[in-house]
Swiss-Prot record:
Described purpose of this protein according to its UniProt entry: Agroclavine dehydrogenase; part of the gene cluster that mediates the biosynthesis of fungal ergot alkaloid ergovaline, the predominant ergopeptine product in E.festucae var. lolii. DmaW catalyzes the first step of ergot alkaloid biosynthesis by condensing dimethylallyl diphosphate (DMAP) and tryptophan to form 4-dimethylallyl-L-tryptophan. The second step is catalyzed by the methyltransferase easF that methylates 4-dimethylallyl-L-tryptophan in the presence of S-adenosyl-L-methionine, resulting in the formation of 4-dimethylallyl-L-abrine.
Subunit record text: Monomer.
InterPro entries: Ergot_Alk_Oxidoreductase, Ergot_alkaloid_biosynthesis, NAD(P)-bd_dom_sf, NmrA-like
Family: Belongs to the fgaFS/easG family.
UniProt catalytic activity: agroclavine + NADP(+) = didehydroagroclavine + NADPH + H(+)
UniProt organism field: Claviceps fusiformis
Protein name: Agroclavine dehydrogenase
Pfam families: NmrA
Length: 289
């Protein structure tokens, strides 16, 4: 089998690609732009351009056809329709297994990825797995992400989550589960909520960063509307900023305040602690432009 990784320039695909290389499993990567780590396997792919759909299902001579797809939805508000169109296209061309990256609070039939989840459940002859991780630790360490940039530039984390708690999870842990989902039939037609090993408020996050990085990192509590305005100041469109800010209100209400053992149950290893993640990545915040 050959595995297709969509979202090739995103956080998860690079980690999964490295695991597939180590396992010597054939794969290709689809995205609008190539990732330096996967450039030799890259195919141009755009969710909003159906002319590119067949491109990512074409394989090099000697490779088996694409039969498994890692689905990472495009970063647009109305994300379900183009993903569903691609799923239907791919399944009509022999793809038999899909693994969807969703989110911990999104149930089947809910908005956005929940609509894609529900659609996968209707396709005969196709198996699927849905991974529903909580918030990524890497949002704090990826340049261009709001939390990372404000920590680096202002020693500040802005949120509207107040005392809401989040079981932050590392992309490396998500990738290890994804590898199993892409290759292990036993995980099919299920969803898995993937959580980190501890519940942290943004005050806790700021305290850990302060301790490890050696600078005083502050958590500034905003209202939802104030956070949306702050995101717009950083160049985010108004509707997208409002959506992102509303997620913090969901956190404040306790929607993410939960723990489980899914990562260890599926991989045999405990998920990473946030303090260890910060220690391993502290140069991101130590180095300033």
């Amino acid at each position: 089998m050959t595995i297709l990784l969509t979202g090739g320039s995103g956080k998860t695909a690079g980690h999964i690609a490295n695991l597939l290389k180590e396992a010597k499993l054939p794969f290709i990567v689809g995205s609008r732009s190539s990732n330096p780590h996967t450039v030799e396997r890259h195919r141009t792919f755009d969710w909003l351009d159906e002319a590119t759909f067949n491109n990512v299902l074409s394989v090099d001579e000697g490779m088996e056809p694409v039969s498994v797809v890692w689905l990472v939805s495009p970063p647009i508000l109305d994300l379900a329709p183009p993903v569903i169109r691609f799923i239907d296209f791919a399944s009509s061309r022999g793809v038999k297994r899909f693994v969807l990256l969703s989110a911990s609070t999104v149930e089947k039939g809910g908005p956005a990825m929940g609509l894609i989840h529900a659609h996968l459940d209707t396709i005969e002859g196709v198996s699927y797995t849905v991974l529903r991780p909580s918030w990524f630790m890497e949002n704090f360490s990826t340049r261009g992400e709001f939390p990372c940039d404000t920590i680096r530039e202002e020693d500040t984390i802005y949120s509207a989550a107040k005392d809401g708690k989040i079981p932050f999870i590392s992309v490396a842990d998500i990738a290890r589960v994804a590898l199993r989902a892409l290759t292990a039939p036993a995980l099919h037609n299920k969803d898995h909520v993937l959580l980190g090993p501890e519940l942290l408020t943004y005050d806790d996050v700021a305290e850990i960063l302060t301790r490890v990085v050696g600078r005083n990192i502050h958590h500034v509590r905003l209202t939802e509307s104030e956070l949306a305005a702050k995101l717009q100041e950083r160049g985010m469109p108004a509707d997208e900023a409002a959506m992102h800010a509303s997620l913090d209100s969901i956190v404040e209400a306790g929607a993410e305040e939960k723990l489980n053992t899914e990562v260890k149950d599926l991989t045999g290893e405990e998920p990473r602690h946030f303090a260890d993640f910060v220690s391993d990545n502290k140069n991101v915040w130590l180095m300033r432009d």
